[in-house]
Design a protein with these regions (language model features):
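Iron-sulfur cluster-binding cysteine motifs and their immediate structural context
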Residues: 161-187, 202-231
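Auxiliary alpha/beta "docking" domains used to position bulky ligands
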Residues: 1-155
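Long, compositionally biased charged/polar accessory segments in the mid-to-C-terminal portions
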Residues: 254, 262-280
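Conserved Radical SAM active-site core
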Residues: 217, 221-251
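Short Fe-S-cluster ligation motifs
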Residues: 186, 190-208, 239-262
Length: 283
């Protein structure tokens, strides 16, 4: 397992979190035909996975933005580190190819990280790690370098707190998520919302996202703080309607384009802030 350890150490150093190697068989078996075909086309001769977590926990002070969206967009931060890791791995293992993924991926990244031994899968679908709880982003590198490793993912203790405290009742007993009732999904949704969905956002105090299921999770008692600079610097915990007033889509992108809350544009955020204001005025 020497090459597995060396490869994982390189990735862990780049992601400033944790990493582990695994064989791809069990992960590929869980994928649909289209995603499996895409993965094998992108990495011909796929024989190994290097899975990693990017911790993002900073602080739990007030605000109307979800914790994951307060620093730089994790896609940008993760991509930079994965590219750096791929370059280092290509030098360490010449002749092999390495391709990084973070969120935009044919692979089930949470399952892959759990299969690699980095944590358990919570009933809210998030990876539960020992050091950082669920305050992590999952990433991975697929390679034709033969790698061993992987074990049946640990099971969530199923205390039921996430299910019972979910504002919209989006989590079912068997761990399925109803997107139409998930506050985080609704704050990102474009187009019309039902009256109940609008009320859910208005009562939440959140302009983007929802951290309720994470805040109550026992795995998140005392998580370590991230060491990733992009998640520590230029933190923005809230947005106001005044800050968005009069901005065109282009101006909004120029001002907030490096933030995770910007990918859906300014319209959903304006709507959410208006719903928060309406709820406050009705009290």
């Amino acid at each position: 397992m020497e090459k597995e350890r060396r490869a994982a150490d390189i990735l862990a150093a780049c992601c400033q979190g944790a990493a582990a190697a695994a064989s791809p068989g069990a992960v590929l078996a869980r994928m649909g035909e289209a995603n499996r075909r895409q993965a094998l086309e992108q990495v011909p001769g796929l024989q190994g996975l290097l899975c990693c977590v990017f911790p993002y926990f900073n602080r739990l002070d007030g605000g109307n933005l979800s914790l994951y969206a307060r620093g730089m967009d994790y896609h940008l931060a993760a991509r930079k580190r994965l590219d750096r890791a791929c370059e280092a791995l290509e030098k360490e293992f010449p002749g092999f190819q390495f391709r990084g993924y973070a969120d935009v991926s044919p692979f089930p990244e949470v399952y892959a990280c759990a299969w690699a031994g980095l944590g358990a899968i919570g009933k809210n679908g998030l990876l539960l790690t020992r050091r950082w709880g669920s305050y992590v982003f999952c990433g991975m590198i697929a390679t034709d370098l033969p790698l061993e490793g992987g074990e049946e993912p640990q099971k969530c203790p199923d205390c039921g707190l996430c299910r019972r405290t979910c504002p919209g009742g989006a989590l079912s007993q068997d761990g399925r998520l109803d997107q139409s009732r998930c506050l985080s999904a609704l704050t990102q949704q474009k187009g019309e919302l039902t009256l109940e969905q609008r009320r859910l956002i208005g009562r939440s105090g959140m302009a983007w996202g929802c951290d309720v299921c994470q805040r109550v999770c026992p795995a998140n008692r005392g998580p370590e703080q991230t060491k990733i600079a992009e998640f520590l610097e230029n933190i923005r915990s809230s947005l106001t309607a005044e800050e968005l007033e009069g901005l065109t889509q282009r101006e909004f992108r120029q001002k907030y384009g490096d933030r995770a809350f910007a990918w859906r544009g300014v319209v959903p955020l304006r709507r959410n802030l208006a719903l928060l204001s309406q709820e406050k005025d009705s009290l």
